[in-house]
C-alpha cells in the first residue's frame, strides 16, 4: 500500500500541487490559524493523545503520526482556529477527510463517549479563552 501511495504521488505532482494550494487558500480565508502556544496548550489538554482514539502522540518518535484535525472541516466553512481543532493521529485525520467530526467519529471502532465529551470540553474552553 505504501508503495502504491508513493508511486501515485510521483505520477500526480499536479494533483498534489493543486490540493496543497487549495488547502492553503482555505486556511487563509478561514482565519489566522493556531499559534505554537495554543498548539501546546491543546496537546497538554489532551495529554498528548489523539482526541479520537486516545493513542499517545507525544515524543519525537511520533512526529510523523501527529496532526491537527479541524472538527468542522475547512471545506465545510469550519474555522482555522484553535477552538475548531483537536490533536489527531494522521491516519484518523485522513480517514475523517471532509466529514464533520460527530458523523465520522460515532462510526469508528475506537469511539468513546468520554473522549467525545473531552472534545466538547476543549471547544468550550478554547472558545471562551480565544474567540473574540
Regions found by a protein language model. Give the residues of each.
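Contiguous alpha-helical segments
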Residues: 1-65, 102-132
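Histidine-centered nuclease catalytic patch
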Residues: 52-90, 96-103
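Glycine-rich loops and low-complexity Gly/Arg-rich segments
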Residues: 91-95, 112-115
Amino acid at each position: 500500500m505504501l508503495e502504491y501511495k508513493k508511486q501515485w504521488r510521483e505520477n500526480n505532482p499536479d494533483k498534489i500541487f493543486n490540493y496543497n494550494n487549495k488547502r492553503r487558500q482555505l486556511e487563509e480565508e478561514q482565519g489566522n490559524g493556531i499559534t505554537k502556544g495554543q498548539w501546546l496548550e491543546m496537546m497538554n489538554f489532551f495529554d498528548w493523545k489523539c482526541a479520537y482514539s486516545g493513542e499517545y502522540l507525544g515524543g519525537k518518535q511520533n512526529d510523523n503520526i501527529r496532526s491537527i484535525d479541524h472538527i468542522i472541516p475547512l471545506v465545510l466553512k469550519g474555522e482555522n482556529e484553535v477552538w475548531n481543532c483537536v490533536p489527531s493521529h494522521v491516519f484518523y485525520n485522513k480517514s475523517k477527510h471532509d466529514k464533520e467530526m460527530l458523523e465520522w467519529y460515532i462510526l469508528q471502532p475506537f469511539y468513546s463517549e468520554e473522549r467525545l465529551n473531552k472534545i466538547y470540553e476543549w471547544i468550550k474552553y478554547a472558545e471562551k479563552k480565544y474567540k473574540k
